Amino acid sequence: MKNKSNIFYSRIVSYVAVAVLLIAISGWIKIPLPIPITFQFATIALLCFLLGEYCTVAVSVYIVMGLIGLPVFAEGGGFSYVLNPTFGYLLGFLVGSFVCGKICTFGDVSTRLKPKRMITAVGIFFVFVYLTGTVYGICIFNFYVEANADFWYLMTVFVFNTLWKDVILCFVIIPLAKKLVPLIGLKK
C-alpha cells in the first residue's frame, strides 16, 4: 500500500512541476495592452480540472518563484511586483484554483465531467480571479500610484479588456478538459 501512495505522490510532484512551467509559458504569451492579455486564466482553469486542488500548489510555486526574482511573471519578477496592479490577478488565481480545484475533484470522474459542474467550477474561478484582480488593481491605482482614475476607466482596464477573451477560452477549455481528465487527470 505504501508503494502505491509513493507513486501517487510522485505523479503529483511531476504534474505540479509541469503545471508551473505551463503557467509561466502562458504568462509570457501575451497581447500588449495597458493590462497585458495572457493565457494564464485558461491554462490555470484547465489545470484545475486536471490536478484538482493540487493546482493551488502549482500556482503557489509560480508566485513564489516570481517573488524571489525569477522572471516568470508576464512583466518580469521580483518582490516589487506586489505593487504591480496585475498582481491581484495572481492572488485571484491562488484562491480561485483552490476553490475550483476542490469542485473539480469532488466525486468520481464521471460526476466531475458533468457540464453543469464544469461550468460552475469555471464560473467560480472566474469570479475569484476577476474580483480579486480588479479590487487589488483599483487599490494599487488609487493608493500607490495615486492616479485618481475614473471608476469606469479602471473597469475597462481591469475587466472589460480581458473579459471577452477569458469567456471565449472558457468555452474552449471545458470540452478540452472533458477529453483530458479521463486520460491524465488525477484520480483519487
Go through each PLM region and give its residues.
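Hydrophobic transmembrane alpha-helices
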Residues: K2-V59, I68
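Alpha-helical transmembrane segments and their lipid-water interface positions
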Residues: A58-Y62, G69-F73, G96, C100, ...
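Short helix-perturbing small/polar motifs within transmembrane alpha-helices
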Residues: K2-N3, R11-I12, V18, I25, ...
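Membrane-embedded alpha-helical hairpins and interfacial helices in multi-pass inner-membrane proteins
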Residues: L113-K188
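Residue-level signature of transmembrane alpha-helical entry/exit and packing/kink sites
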Residues: F8-A19, I37-I44, C55, P85, ...
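Membrane-water interface at transmembrane helix exits
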Residues: S26-I31, M65, C100, C104-D108, ...
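Hydrophobic alpha-helical transmembrane segments
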Residues: K30-A42, I63-P71, C104-I119, L180
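Interfacial aromatic-anchored transmembrane helix boundaries in multi-pass membrane proteins
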Residues: S26-I37, I63-G96
